[in-house]
Amino acid sequence: MLQVLLEIKHQVKQASYVHETELNDAQLLVGNLGLRHRRGLREHPHVYDLGEEWNRWTNLPFVFARWVLRNDIEPGNALVIEDSLFTSLQDWSDGLYRVSGPAIPLPIHPQEIHMYTQGLRYFMGRPEEKSVIQFQEYLDKLR
């Protein structure tokens, strides 16, 4: 997504990617590292959330991942898997605020956890499908 945003949205064609230990103008931080430094780094104080940048640009949510099943899965088994996913999602959200402490220590306030998790969507609707199609079209332009 970073390449799409840089090259297509911002017309930055000469971006080069270097190791984090090399001199750089910016860093891409993901996962726990991204959450840990969500307010920026001393040497890089400006923060851009890629999902937020995509949404501002396209007015669509970005689909970072999705669950898919093979076509040859029997319908009954597919329903069991779907039900398991929904149950796990409910258990996760129910237990989110009952945890005695984070599994991975991150300096993050419960209100920030709430705001972060409220932005997550676990269902594919029309906007999400449109977003996947739009992203694929942009990827095709980069080839």
What would you call each of these model-derived segments?
Residues A15-V99:
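Pocket-lining segment of extracytoplasmic ligand-binding domains
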Residues K9, L85-S88, L120:
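Alpha-helix boundary/capping residues
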Residues M1-L2, L29-G31, V63-W67, L120, ...:
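Long, contiguous hydrophobic alpha-helical segments, chiefly transmembrane helices and signal peptides
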Residues R98-R143:
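An extracytoplasmic/periplasmic, membrane-proximal ligand-sensing/linker region
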Residues Q3-E7, F86, Q136:
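Generic solvent-exposed, charged/amphipathic alpha-helical segments
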Residues M1-S16, Y97:
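Ligand-binding cleft/hinge of the Venus flytrap
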